């Protein structure tokens, strides 16, 4: 019985045959694991790059549009201001210093910003441009003739003076009555002035006022109804009352 010894070359060939196969399979698995990571990294990098480029381009375009709109708005406002100034100068030269009621009114609050007049520019000396004031206030205030003249429409002036005083003759009589009564009420006025200085309240006493007869006169008829009661005593030239006999109460005076 004989045994055959295997050939070492064949064994070496077998081993050499199996080793390259195992190495090739492991390399294929490593390629399958590395390729998705590379693809994802490339996609993320491309997306980030495109986003940055879009943001930068959009900001530049927005700044350019804002600059163009600002320049256009400034140009339109400047042109609008000069047009209004020329129109105001023509109206001022043709119509004098008066402004008609048909002048354009102030724009509404919903109007765009370019329709509003320019802001009021006050210099350091306090001078104000007249044209700017004309644009802000197109209607001039009422004059003296409109308020106090014969055709006044802004203010009502009563034609009748309220009794018992008059608009023309009340001051001399009142001053004369106060001068005649100043000697008697001087002490009262001094006391009232001291009281007013302490309390700082403006009060008027009935003693300082002139009587009704001194202001209106004794001969002028009065439309006021007489009050029931004793008649006032007659006074002499010095101003002191003369005591007289009290009248008997009549049935008409009894209330």
Swiss-Prot record:
Keywords: Membrane, Transmembrane, Transmembrane helix. It is found in: Membrane. Residues 217-226 have a biased composition (Low complexity). The keyword Membrane applies. It is a single-pass membrane protein. Residues 193-206, 234-243 have a biased composition (Polar residues). Residues 69-90 have a biased composition (Basic residues). Residues 69-109, 160-255 are annotated as: Disordered. InterPro entries: BEAN1. Interacts with NEDD4. This is Protein BEAN1. The lineage of its organism: Eukaryota, Metazoa, Chordata, Craniata, Vertebrata.
């Amino acid at each position: 019985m004989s045994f055959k010894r295997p050939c070492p070359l064949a064994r070496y060939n077998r081993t050499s045959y199996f080793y390259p196969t195992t190495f090739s399979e492991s390399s294929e698995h490593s390629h399958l694991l590395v390729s998705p990571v590379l693809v994802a990294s490339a996609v993320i990098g491309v997306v980030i790059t495109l986003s940055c480029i879009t943001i930068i381009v959009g900001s530049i375009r927005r700044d350019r549009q804002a600059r163009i709109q600002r320049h256009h708005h400034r140009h339109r406002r400047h042109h609008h201001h000069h047009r209004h100034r020329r129109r105001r100068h023509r109206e001022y030269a043709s119509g004098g210093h008066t402004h008609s009621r048909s002048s354009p009114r102030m724009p509404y609050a919903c109007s765009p910003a370019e329709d509003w007049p320019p802001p009021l520019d006050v210099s350091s000396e306090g001078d104000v441009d007249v044209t700017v004031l004309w644009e802000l206030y197109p209607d001039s205030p009422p004059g003296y003739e409109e308020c106090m003249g014969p055709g006044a429409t802004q203010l009502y002036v009563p034609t009748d003076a309220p009794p018992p005083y008059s608009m023309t003759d009340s001051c001399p009589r009142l001053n004369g009555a106060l001068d005649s009564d100043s000697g008697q009420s001087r002490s009262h006025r001094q006391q009232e002035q001291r009281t007013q200085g302490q309390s700082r309240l403006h009060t008027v006493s009935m003693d300082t006022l002139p009587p009704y007869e001194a202001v209106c006169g004794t001969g002028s008829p009065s439309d006021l109804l007489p009050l029931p009661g004793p008649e006032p005593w007659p006074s002499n030239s010095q101003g002191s009352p003369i005591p007289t006999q009290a009248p008997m109460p009549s049935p008409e005076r009894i209330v």
